[in-house]
Amino acid sequence: MKVARREPSNDAIVLGVLDAVERNPAVTQRSVARELGIALGLVNAYLHRCLSKGLIKIGQVPPRRYAYYLTPRGMTEKSRLTATYLMDSFAFFREARTQCSELFQTLAARGQRRLALVGGGDLAEIARLVARDHLIEIAGIAPASADAAGLTANLEGFGPFDAIVVTALEQSRETFSAAVELLGAERVYAPALLRVPPLAPAAAAGSKR
């Protein structure tokens, strides 16, 4: 099952709009909407908000088109929002690194040292880096899947492994459930930041393949 894409925050949208304008003054609202993954009307509303706050100015270019330009105030705001974004990113990195380290320490103590990561992206890369500090072997990083059959196909070629660690930032619950169905609850884990809720007893029983 495909889950809805997480909506960006207000600051993220403003940063995206300012960045798009800085890169290309002749950028269209439609292209900004496509790039940010938001509705066209929302882009229009944020452009007007940026205009009213003096973050951008508008100029006309032929033929009957408009160009947007960052004002000095807009450049300052873009720098501030960028710094905030990076700080948030660093906070994510620190939290992910700490939680992966604690999880791998626990798994190593249980003798589960060869792991398959399920779900690519930033969290998977952080997990792979942290694994080296705990003598954990990563069998591979598989794409996330919301069903056991798809997950089985994605794990093909990994060879034997002791456990799955879910690292998917999207479809986390669905992927976790599929992994439990495939291996059983005692061989499936996820960092706490994914906030995967406990499974019902029937689902947690799994097939234990």
Region roles according to the model:
Residues 22, 30, 35-55, 61-209:
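Hydrophobic, well-ordered beta-alpha structural blocks that scaffold small-molecule cofactor pockets
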Residues 2-3, 56-58:
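N-terminal-biased segments
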Residues 12-26:
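Short amphipathic alpha-helical interface segments
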Residues 1-15:
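Short alpha-helical segments that sit at the start of domains
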